[in-house]
From Swiss-Prot:
Family: Belongs to the CbiD family.
EC top class named in words: transferase
NCBIfam families for this protein: cbiD, PRK00075.1-1
Stated name of the protein: Cobalt-precorrin-5B C(1)-methyltransferase
Amino acid sequence: MSTKELREGFTTGACSAAAAKAATRLLLKGEPVLEIETTLPNDRQVLFPVKRCQLEGEVAICSVVKDAGDDPDCTHGAELTARVRLTKESKIVLKGGDGVATVTKTGLGIEVGEPAINPIPRKNISEMILEELKGSSFNGAEVEISVPGGQEMAKKTMNKRLGLIGGISIIGTTGIVKPFSTAAFKASVIQAIRMAREYEVDTVILTTGGKSEKFAMNLFPNLKELSFIQAGDFIGTGIKTSVKEFIRHVIVVGMIGKLSKMADGVMMTHRGGSSVNTKMLSDIARSVGIPEPIAIDIQNANTARHALEICKENGYEIITTKICEIVARNCSKHAGTNMSISCYMVDFDGTLLGKFENFSQKSKLRKGI
């Protein structure tokens, strides 16, 4: 039976970079820009249609409408708008305009007071502008990203709770939106595990996303490519299917946010469906001997990432190993069998932070082909 291929979408970050590049080209060429080709953070070339294209003296305003693909969220249809002015100075100054949130709490990887434009989109926006400036008499630019209606969109997110006030966040690590929360994606996870078993793969690596999959491949270079499965928010589905398909060993690889939810017993980890229980994280901290003042700081953290930063700053990375152990045990309970389940936590740059290994005697990480 054939299955419909999932249609990917594009992140707010990718659309912002495209809009900024279009505005830069408009300033340099002085001619309407109907479409713009950009390079996503994952190095893919994409052609975006440009909706708004307006020249006002030394300023250009262009916009790109976000298409979220087969997993539309509250930002689907958002008009990512870039207002650009070119400068002689060799730097890109990035500002947040109407509809883009401002960071008011620590722990998000962005300085307090800065617009909620994540590091990778910031880099992508700068790179696309500089690409256009090659060979021109300009060396930099002032860029303002705005999203009409962003404040209303933000009401459907957790932004306010996280201290992101005034609009949505400009996010995305690859530029691509994969439809992790659709029934179709769930079906694709099941299909991938069945295919792995068909090719006699006895160990599968369930990852929570593209970045963690890339890092997992570095951790296990000898495994077949079929072993690596992006389960997204459906780790629980991946585990249950692995049991049905007689997979001998499951390894879960993820980052602090998703694994913290799984340590709390949540097997459907979509960020809109559940939030990280920092009280639970503080209890884990106490269980491994982390002093009470630090445990309280962990409980009061804004995010799991913030909690991790607190542990790192105080030399208590040991919590990551305990989280991995709890995740592995929760996954084993979810499986309902004695199937071997291990867990690895990676940092945002791929560094291995902690692991809990549960290899059976018969399970071997066989060399891939």
